[in-house]
A protein has these predicted regions:
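Short hydrophobic/glycine-rich mini-motifs in sensory/regulatory modules
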Residues: 109-119
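Juxtadomain coupling helices with adjacent low-complexity linkers
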Residues: 117-151
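Signal-transmission linkers at sensory-effector interfaces
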Residues: 1-21
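Signal-transducing coiled-coil linker helices
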Residues: 20-33
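Regulatory sensory and allosteric helical modules in signal-transduction proteins
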Residues: 53-107
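Cytosolic beta-strand hydrophobic patch enriched in CBS
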Residues: 47, 107-110
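Short, hydrophobic-rich beta-strand element in sensory/regulatory alpha-beta domains
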Residues: 34-38, 42-58
């Protein structure tokens, strides 16, 4: 298990914003899953991005419109979870300024080749392997819901 650092004073607003154009069954799943992650892990912020649109922002996030950069795009291209345990040492951390400007750790979890879950942690090295596995499995469920609902 990683040793989490001191909890950061994150910049941003506590938000819960989602795309109203999604079917209610999908909104319900995203609401449930994001709440579960925020309450059962060290996550402070969640964003779900699908095909150029941020379909969910929850937790301490920026009001600015997040656009994925090289790191997020690599995650969905390779279909691999990317863990940035300490963003202070990551040269590409500016990619996440419009997610949560001073977030100390990040998980990028691909859903499919055009969608991903972006999760920011309260402190450096705060996510466990168990957190990663649970969120990765949830991403598979989301992908199935997207397929069933033509999203």
């Amino acid at each position: 298990e990683p040793l989490a650092g001191e909890k950061a004073n994150l910049q941003g607003d506590n938000q819960f914003v989602f795309d109203n154009n999604l079917p209610s069954i999908v909104i319900d799943e995203l609401a449930w899953g994001s709440e579960a992650i925020l309450t059962s892990t060290a996550a402070a912020a969640i964003l779900i991005h699908n095909d150029g649109i941020n379909i969910l922002k929850r937790g301490i996030t920026s009001k600015n419109n997040f656009k994925p950069g090289e790191t997020c795009l690599r995650s969905i291209k390779d279909m691999k979870l990317i863990s940035l345990a300490n963003t202070k040492f990551y040269p590409g951390r500016d990619e996440f300024l419009y997610f949560c400007p001073n977030v100390p750790s990040i998980l990028i979890v691909p859903i499919n080749t055009k969608s991903f879950i972006l999760i920011g942690g309260w402190s450096a090295k705060c996510f466990t392997k168990s957190d990663e596995k649970w969120i990765n499995n949830w991403s598979k469920k989301i992908n199935n819901m997207f397929l069933i609902n033509n999203i």
